[in-house]
């Protein structure tokens, strides 16, 4: 099986959330589950930000769900959505 490039959008639970802290926790939580291709803070407007995360996972059933579940367990994370999935 090949690998898949997945783009995730991680929204904080509230506007006061510490984005840098969430980024650090994401890195720790997903270590060993996937590799990080890119992680950026994106401004929505009016001080609101989200994390755009590109990861590479194995093309196996349930891999993306495992990563999403690991991220959603982080305090301060509100919503996670998968924006793009590409076979590489």
Curated annotation (Swiss-Prot):
Q: Which UniProt keywords apply?
A: Elongation factor, Protein biosynthesis
For this protein, the record's SMART domains field holds: EF1_GNE (SM00888)
Q: Name one GO molecular function term.
A: translation elongation factor activity
At the top level of its lineage, which domain of life is listed? Archaea
The protein's job, in short, is: Promotes the exchange of GDP for GTP in EF-1-alpha/GDP, thus allowing the regeneration of EF-1-alpha/GTP that could then be used to form the ternary complex EF-1-alpha/GTP/AAtRNA.
Q: Which family does it belong to?
A: Belongs to the EF-1-beta/EF-1-delta family.
Recorded protein name is Elongation factor 1-beta
From which organism does this entry originate? Thermoplasma acidophilum (strain ATCC 25905 / DSM 1728 / JCM 9062 / NBRC 15155 / AMRC-C165)
Query: What's the gene?
Result: ef1b
